[in-house]
Amino acid sequence: MAEAQKLHEEKPRSFRREDIPAKGYTYKDYLTWGDDVRFELIDGIPHMMAAPTLWHQRVTGEIFGQLRNWLEDKPCEVYVAPCDVRLFPEADKSDRVVVQPDVLVICDEEKLSDGKACRGAPDFVVEVTSKGTKGKDFREKKALYEKAGVREYWVVEEGAVYKYAPVDGEYRETVYDLDEDSEISVDMLPGCSIDFKKIAEFASRG
């Protein structure tokens, strides 16, 4: 009981540098924090995740739904946040990166074998931006997904989609204006595309 209380008290509630251990937190630490507050762990530093807006939830849910329908009876699986992803897993749980992408597709069932998290890079990741996450989506998380080997990464914001896929080992960006490109193909899933006209109609509801 005392140990459980100690772990609860050690849960990071602020992001002042002086409160964070010199080596940062690990996945092993992350597992002690519980579910009452959602965090991502980036290079050992906890980042609190704010409650999403209705627009964010509608867009995320519709992308997930379209992918789920397309992937029916196919070997890959699609998940929606919160779903922990250990991009650089270590056997002793000392890895210092745990993210929760908005939508992710995993084609290697071995990465899901522990039933708790995706161990290793998903094949396809979608992040839907918000005011609080936009910078992180385009910088830190893009760099992490590229390094980990995510085959395709999208950042979705109102009016545009930014697609990243590796060319000669580095992500190349393609930008889609949703006023002109209402249907965007998922390159790593040949034949699959996301209908953003349908998403816009759903997301704009009052």
Specify the residue positions occupied by each region the protein language model found:
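Gly/Pro/Ser/Thr-rich low-complexity, intrinsically disordered segments predominantly at protein N-termini
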Residues: M1-G206
